[in-house]
């Protein structure tokens, strides 16, 4: 009887605990539901668009990136205690999103004391490729950056050089080109932010919220860093003219003038005579050509790297008078100058901004050659009603056009400027919003139950860490879609690694798969099948050919299922891909067969002739490519058997023989077997 009473008492205690737990869960769910239903407004920009950052249990503004302190998820006292150090970083800018700039956009940087203009894509590609520690966040590649500074404005609206802490890149399928007054332009993604004027304040605005006629903020003048250099005003002016209109080699410097430029001709002759140079003058029609021989000057030009038609770094660091003389030499007393080199035109624009001059840019075509006309403007327009901004380094220009364009390289590029959230880039000095925000340190709990000294933890500590790991897994992967992505992306990495696919193909496949998840196309289909189809589509989009059979073997998914899923994704996601070109397979097949470059070139030539006659239409690209390689190997004496070629190409010997007969007959190729 006693044991029965004890059992009933135990059962009653368990029921009470279960009711308390249920009540606690219901209260927690109700509290979270109230947070969801309550309208959340960003205290910084006033936006109502928010994003849940499950990595840190935060709600983040989708526009400006502010972490909203009052709206944190409540995920338990143990986690809050463990994550206490992160709380001091609340209300920092740290949106889990990315903005982006096109590869070709110019940006002025300071590196190792040198100031130069480079393409942002070229700069970031170099940093990432040389980095030993690349961090990945989804499709984003992020690398630390040291020793590079870019121009950004401070709280007083003055520009200065500031250090870059991180750079990144990610695949992109579209860009938007913004053109403002003076034909200044920049290419960015739709989610990128530029700066405009609202209530006499400079504020960021997304590109997809812009319209023609809106006012954008650009740089009116850039900071000067002056150093004592061994260049005088006369040489600076001649140097500008050499870069614009002259050239030199190991023996001589050649300068060309119009006949009516007598004042400048005499000035040039007098200058070089003062340096004991040998001068020869040639005259033809209305042109005057001056040939100068002076070994010391030629060596100085080589040292300054003048031959590449870019403004030397030393000019960007020169005093105002030297820069002014250099610009006078470039323009040769005229208000406008035509440049064939876009890079030189970009350099001139940035140098003009350093001497507080502005310019318009017009793209023209002369004899089917694209040129860039830069016209100097000394009187800069500013809006006098904006009294707080009159003394700033800004100029305010209206938008003329917003056009959707293709990206230059398939990638978009980002960088982080701490404590500034902006930088200057683009053809004309656009002020762009800081692209990657610093999200602070991530909390990662090690799987080992050891302390910092390597000693084993007590049973209580191990139990606490077990619960913390469980909470971390829950907040990192919080819903079915994220669990799906976590598994799918690991499967994607496995398959692409097995196929030896480059990184940009992996990232394109990830974009396609993520798009399928967001549109709800995964339901009713296997994750492995959709991943394999996304990889096949990415291979075709990036022109890195892989057959369905190869992907089926690597993914362990049936070939027909991959094909069906691929067609479904292409239709629903509007993926437009051209038929695979047999030529794309030639380099890989030739490499695996150990054939020289001559055979590869001959096979490509055969396929080009076949395409012109329509022999590749309706034929499997791998079979046609294999037959062309077989024919080329026989013709050039590097013969491979049909069986060897068939094994590499993944086709049958019968297919090769059939394609071989078609090609030799219709192209009149005489092959001696």
Swiss-Prot record:
Gene that specifies this protein: tfb
PTM section of the record: This protein undergoes a protein self splicing that involves a post-translational excision of the intervening region (intein) followed by peptide ligation.
Annotated positions binding Zn(2+): 42, 45, 61, 64
UniProt-listed InterPro entries: Cyclin-like_dom (IPR013763), Cyclin-like_sf (IPR036915), Hint_dom_C (IPR003586), Hint_dom_N (IPR003587), Hint_dom_sf (IPR036844), Homing_endonucl (IPR027434), INTEIN (IPR006142), Intein_C (IPR030934)
Highest rank taxon of the organism: Archaea
Similarity-based family: Belongs to the TFIIB family.
Function as written in the Swiss-Prot or TrEMBL entry: Stabilizes TBP binding to an archaeal box-A promoter. Also responsible for recruiting RNA polymerase II to the pre-initiation complex (DNA-TBP-TFIIB).
SUPFAM superfamilies: Cyclin-like, Hedgehog/intein (Hint) domain, Homing endonucleases, Zinc beta-ribbon
Domain DOD-type homing endonuclease: 238-357
Residues in Sequence repeats: 490-573, 584-665
E.C. number(s) listed in UniProt: 3.1.-.-
Zinc finger regions, TFIIB-type: 38-69
Lineage: Archaea, Methanobacteriati, Methanobacteriota, Methanomada group, Methanococci
A GO molecular-function annotation: TBP-class protein binding
HAMAP family, A to Z: TF2B_arch
Name of the protein this chain belongs to: Transcription initiation factor IIB
A Pfam family per the record: Zn_Ribbon_TF
Species of the source: Methanocaldococcus jannaschii (strain ATCC 43067 / DSM 2661 / JAL-1 / JCM 10045 / NBRC 100440)
Record-level GO cellular component terms: transcription preinitiation complex
Single GO BP term: intein-mediated protein splicing
TM stretches of this protein: none
Keyword field: Autocatalytic cleavage, Endonuclease, Hydrolase, Intron homing, Metal-binding, Nuclease, Protein splicing, Repeat, Transcription, Transcription regulation, Zinc, Zinc-finger
């Amino acid at each position: 009887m006693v044991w029965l009473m004890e059992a009933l008492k135990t059962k009653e205690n368990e029921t009470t605990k279960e009711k308390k737990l249920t009540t606690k869960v219901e209260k927690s769910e109700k509290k979270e539901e109230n947070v969801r239903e309550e309208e959340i407004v960003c205290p910084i920009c006033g936006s109502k668009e928010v994003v849940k950052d499950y990595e840190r249990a935060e709600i983040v503004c989708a526009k400006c990136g502010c972490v909203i302190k009052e709206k944190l998820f409540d995920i338990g006292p143990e986690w809050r205690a463990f994550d206490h150090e992160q709380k001091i970083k609340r209300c920092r800018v740290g949106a889990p999103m990315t903005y982006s700039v096109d590869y070709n956009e110019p940006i002025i940087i300071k590196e190792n004391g040198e100031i130069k203009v480079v393409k942002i894509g070229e700069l970031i590609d170099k940093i990432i490729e040389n980095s030993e520690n690349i961090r990945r966040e989804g499709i984003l590649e992020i690398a630390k950056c040291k020793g590079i500074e870019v121009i950004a404005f401070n709280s007083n609206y003055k520009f200065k050089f500031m250090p870059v802490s991180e750079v990144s890149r990610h695949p992109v399928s579209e860009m938007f080109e913004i053109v403002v007054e003076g034909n200044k332009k920049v290419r960015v993604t739709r989610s990128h932010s530029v700066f405009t004027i609202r209530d006499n304040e400079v504020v960021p605005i997304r590109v997809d919220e812009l319209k023609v006629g809106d006012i954008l903020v650009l740089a009116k003048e850039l900071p000067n860093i002056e150093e004592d250099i061994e260049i005088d005003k006369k040489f600076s002016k001649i140097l500008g003219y050499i870069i614009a209109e002259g050239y030199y080699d190991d023996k001589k410097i050649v300068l060309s003038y119009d006949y009516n430029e007598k004042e400048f001709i005499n000035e040039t002759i007098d200058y070089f005579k003062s340096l004991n140079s040998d001068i020869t003058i040639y005259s033809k029609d209305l042109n005057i050509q001056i040939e100068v021989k002076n070994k010391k000057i030629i060596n100085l030009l080589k040292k300054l790297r003048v031959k590449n038609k870019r403004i030397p770094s030393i000019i960007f660091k020169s005093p105002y008078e030297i820069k002014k003389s250099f610009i006078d030499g470039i323009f040769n007393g005229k208000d406008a100058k035509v440049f064939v080199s876009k890079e030189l035109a970009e350099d001139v624009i940035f140098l003009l901004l350093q001497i507080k001059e502005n310019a318009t840019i017009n793209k023209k075509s002369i004899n089917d050659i694209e040129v860039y006309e830069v016209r100097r403007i000394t009187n800069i327009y500013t809006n006098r009603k904006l009294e707080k901004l009159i003394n700033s380094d800004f100029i305010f220009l209206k938008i003329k056009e917003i056009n959707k364009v293709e990206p230059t390289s398939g990638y978009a590029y980002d960088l982080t400027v701490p404590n500034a959230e902006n930088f200057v880039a683009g053809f004309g000095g656009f002020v762009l919003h800081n692209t990657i925000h610093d999200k602070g340190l991530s909390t990662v709990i090690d799987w080992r139950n050891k302390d910092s000294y390597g000693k084993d933890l007590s049973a209580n500590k191990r139990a606490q860490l077990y619960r913390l790991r469980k909470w971390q897994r829950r907040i990192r992967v919080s819903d079915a879609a994220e669990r799906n992505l976590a598994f799918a992306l690991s499967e994607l990495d496995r398959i692409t690694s097995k196929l030896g696919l480059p990184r940009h193909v992996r990232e394109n496949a990830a974009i396609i798969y993520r798009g399928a998840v967001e549109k709800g196309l995964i339901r009713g289909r296997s994750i492995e099948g959709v991943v394999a189809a996304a990889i096949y589509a990415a291979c075709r989009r990036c022109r890195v050919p892989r057959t369905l059979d190869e992907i089926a073997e690597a993914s362990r998914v049936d070939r027909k299922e991959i094909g069906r899923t691929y067609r479904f994704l292409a239709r629903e996601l509007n993926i437009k891909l051209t038929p695979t070109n047999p030529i794309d397979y030639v380099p890989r097949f030739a490499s695996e067969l150990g054939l020289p470059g001559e055979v590869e070139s001959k096979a490509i030539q055969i396929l080009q002739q076949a395409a012109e006659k329509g022999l590749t239409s309706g034929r499997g690209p791998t079979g046609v490519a294999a037959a062309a390689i077989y024919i080329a190997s026989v013709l050039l004496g590097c013969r491979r058997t049909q069986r060897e070629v068939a094994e590499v190409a993944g086709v049958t010997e019968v297919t090769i023989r059939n394609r071989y007969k078609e090609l030799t007959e219709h192209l009149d190729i005489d092959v001696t077997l």
